[in-house]
Amino acid sequence: MDWKIELIPVPVTDVDRAKAFYEKVGFNADHDHRVHEGLRFVQLTPPGSACSIVLGDGITDKTPGTQEIQVVVADAEAARRQLLDAGVEASEVDVQPWGNFVYFGDPDGNRWSLQAIASRPNG
């Protein structure tokens, strides 16, 4: 049986600011619903991903700025250019034997690693 990750909660201080930031990065806003007083559910999906992030009011007790997420991209330099073109501060490409990485953070300090994998063992 396959197990597939669906949602990763991202703690934020300002839901509207965070939603606008992730849309600027290129995420699709799938849902934005106030379920009830104290619970707002905002689901955003990175381009080409089957896994989404969720942010909102009443979503997580984690402290904003403490989440770290790593995703795979086809080309680290192209991903970096996309971030810079969107006005997002991004690191230089970090070249490692197991892949190339680009790092950026959201307005609350949650950290993202974008990895272009050199190769995977067993395919």
Can you say where each PLM-predicted feature lies in the sequence?
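Vicinal oxygen chelate
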Residues: M1, L7, D32-H33, R40-Q43, ...
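Short, solvent-exposed beta-strand edge segments and adjacent coil->beta transition regions
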Residues: D2-L7, P64-E68
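Short hydrophobic/aromatic beta-strand micro-patches
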Residues: P9-P11, Q70-A74
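Short amphipathic alpha-helices within nucleic acid-binding modules
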Residues: F21, E77-Q82
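Short, charged/polar surface micro-motifs in flexible loops or helix N-caps
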Residues: P47-C51, T60-K62, D75-A78
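Short, basic, helix/turn surface patches
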Residues: G56-P64, A116-G123
